[in-house]
UniProtKB/Swiss-Prot annotation:
NCBIfam families: ispD. InterPro entries: IspD, IspD/TarI, IspD/TarI_cytidylyltransf_bact, ISPD_synthase_CS, Nucleotide-diphossugar_trans. It catalyses: 2-C-methyl-D-erythritol 4-phosphate + CTP + H(+) = 4-CDP-2-C-methyl-D-erythritol + diphosphate. This is 2-C-methyl-D-erythritol 4-phosphate cytidylyltransferase. It comes from the Bacteria. The keyword Transferase applies. Pathway: Isoprenoid biosynthesis; isopentenyl diphosphate biosynthesis via DXP pathway; isopentenyl diphosphate from 1-deoxy-D-xylulose 5-phosphate: step 2/6. Gene3D superfamilies: Spore Coat Polysaccharide Biosynthesis Protein SpsA, Chain A (3.90.550.10). Catalyzes the formation of 4-diphosphocytidyl-2-C-methyl-D-erythritol from CTP and 2-C-methyl-D-erythritol 4-phosphate (MEP). The record marks R14, K21 as: Transition state stabilizer. Belongs to the IspD/TarI cytidylyltransferase family. IspD subfamily. HAMAP family: IspD (MF_00108). Keywords: Isoprene biosynthesis, Nucleotidyltransferase, Transferase.
Length: 226
């Protein structure tokens, strides 16, 4: 069994919508509802903890009334940074050995990816899902190319990311003590010298970040309905 943690206190400035992007609609249903539905049928998911901006609590609670979820959902105070929100959520985790941390704006995660991440977390203590990088990647400084990075060793990392509760708590406490801010939770585990298992993600598992992503998401849903 695991607890799903969703840091949902961000404002999504790149979307330019003037509100939390999780409230934006894909096929007339909020992004966050699509995301929750991806997990609610998973028998291994015990409950869901969402770290939110307290000012948005009424909106989230209204969504849960309009779109009920078949799992217990708990709203807690989010932090100034995503990392703070996850740390706060860990404090509310009880009676489970593992947690999965997932971006609320990744509504197309598949059950296979979820199960693969959980299995790898049980094996290694920490796990991520990732896909091979398709594009050529170059390092650029002051407007000119300084290096072409070897693509064969690169992966684009997604969520969910899975962890034993004790390991993730240790990693977060260490980062907090050193004022270290990582780009994801796995980087905090890497920082304390622990292994992170990697499983195959999905190119459909996009993070809806920009207006263009909303159009892509609508297309994905259209294909799924066929």
């Amino acid at each position: 069994m695991y607890t799903l943690i969703i840091p949902a206190a961000g404002q999504g400035k790149r979307m330019g919508a003037g509100k939390n992007k999780l409230f934006l609609l894909i096929n007339e249903v909020p992004i966050i509802v699509h995301t929750l539905r991806a997990f609610e049928k998973d028998k291994a998911c015990k409950n869901i903890i969402m770290a939110i901006n307290e000012e948005e609590r009424p909106y989230f609670e209204e969504l849960m009334q309009k779109y009920p979820v078949e799992k217990p959902v708990q709203f807690i105070q989010g932090g100034a940074e995503r990392q703070d929100s996850v740390y706060n959520a860990i404090q509310h985790t009880t009676d489970v050995e593992y947690v999965l941390v997932h971006d609320g704006a990744r509504p197309f995660v598949t059950n296979k990816v979820i199960q693969d991440v959980l299995t790898a977390a049980e094996k290694y203590g920490a796990s991520i899902c990732a896909v091979p990088v398709k594009d050529t990647v170059k390092k650029v400084e002051q407007g000119v190319v300084v290096e072409t990075v070897e693509r064969s060793q690169l992966k684009a990392v997604q969520t969910p990311q899975g962890f034993s509760v004790s390991l993730l708590l240790e990693a977060h406490r260490s980062a907090k003590q050193s004022c270290f801010l990582g780009t994801d939770d796995a980087s905090l585990v890497e920082r304390i010298g622990k292994q992170v298992g990697v499983v195959e993600g999905s190119y459909y598992n996009i993070k809806v970040t920009t207006p263009e992503d909303l159009l892509i998401a609508e297309s994905f849903l259209h294909v799924q309905k066929k």
